[in-house]
Amino acid sequence: MDLVGPRYIKGDGRFYSMNVIDLYSHRVFVESSRTKEDDNIAQGLLRCWKSMGRPDFLQIDNELSFRGSNRYPRSLGLVLRLCLYFGVHPVFIPVGEPWRDGVVEHFNDTYDKKFFRRQWFSSYVMLKRQSKNFQQFHNKHHRYSCLSRSRLKNDNLLHIGQVQPEGHFYNQRIVNLQSLFASS
């Protein structure tokens, strides 16, 4: 999850975009808001989880809206408390290293180049409507290199059924991939 902004709509003020991307399916959820207050982020996360399902982990940067308060640095903010309440483990990337969250940063670039810079928005309401249209289009049509057809051929998937040594870090990913292919 990442927060993009502030961005500006000519004659209608600023907005922020909360972008969430599922690392396995590359489905996205885009939520625009006027402010980056933690209650807006928390409400957006609830809508995201209702739409996409609740994840096991949520990788986030150290944005103040995500982590809590500078005034009370040892207290948990609303977004963190929401994650913990629903059993979602927040994973923070190191400060000043956005490349550690490369998948969502790549989507932010796609959002900027293929959506925000290619259209003119007369109002914030129009932007919210069009961002949901972009979200639906992206989830249906946009493909990343990891989902290329050559990687989905059966001969490349033979390793999924192989037994890995105990404690091998691919075990969890293989289980997730098996459930992904079993459902399709």
Language-model features and meaning:
Residues 112-184:
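C-terminal domain-tail junction helix/linker
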